[in-house]
């Protein structure tokens, strides 16, 4: 996966679910992870890719995700030898305790992509960020990888 606007070039690890039914986060700051129960990037409805904002005191793969702007490209190489090219249309911040799962991950009538990381202030007691950053993107083309 490449996101030129924020200098991301990362392979994708497969991610499943945790015991509580939420998506398992990537095991470290790199690489980003694709939720394998969601569609392959470029198929109908949104594919979901998550990455850490930081890890062990160092920037993670999605450290600059909040800096994406509408029009920025995300390129995801697929196992079929094609690359899905997406265009970011918005980036939003949501409180984790009010994360709109249906609005972010729910069905849409086109091929989309959601990039998700942590954001907001850091809760020292919980050792977690209070918010999530979600970038919304739509497929614009496929090309040879």
Name each region found by the language model.
Residues 1-69, 77-82, 90-145:
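Solvent-exposed, non-transmembrane regions of membrane-associated and secreted proteins
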């Amino acid at each position: 996966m490449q996101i030129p606007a924020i200098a991301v070039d990362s392979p994708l690890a497969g991610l499943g679910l945790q015991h509580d039914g939420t998506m398992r986060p990537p095991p470290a700051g790199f690489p980003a992870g694709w939720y394998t129960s969601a569609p392959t990037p470029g198929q109908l409805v949104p594919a979901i890719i998550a990455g850490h904002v930081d890890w062990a005191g160092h920037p993670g793969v999605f450290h600059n995700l909040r800096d994406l702007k509408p029009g920025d490209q995300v390129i995801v190489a697929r196992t079929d030898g094609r690359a899905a090219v997406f265009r970011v249309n918005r980036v939003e911040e949501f409180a984790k305790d009010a994360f709109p799962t249906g609005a972010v991950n729910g069905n849409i009538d086109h091929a989309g992509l959601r990039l998700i990381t942590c954001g907001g202030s850091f809760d020292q007691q919980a050792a977690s960020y209070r918010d999530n950053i979600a970038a919304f993107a739509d497929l614009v083309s496929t090309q040879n990888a």
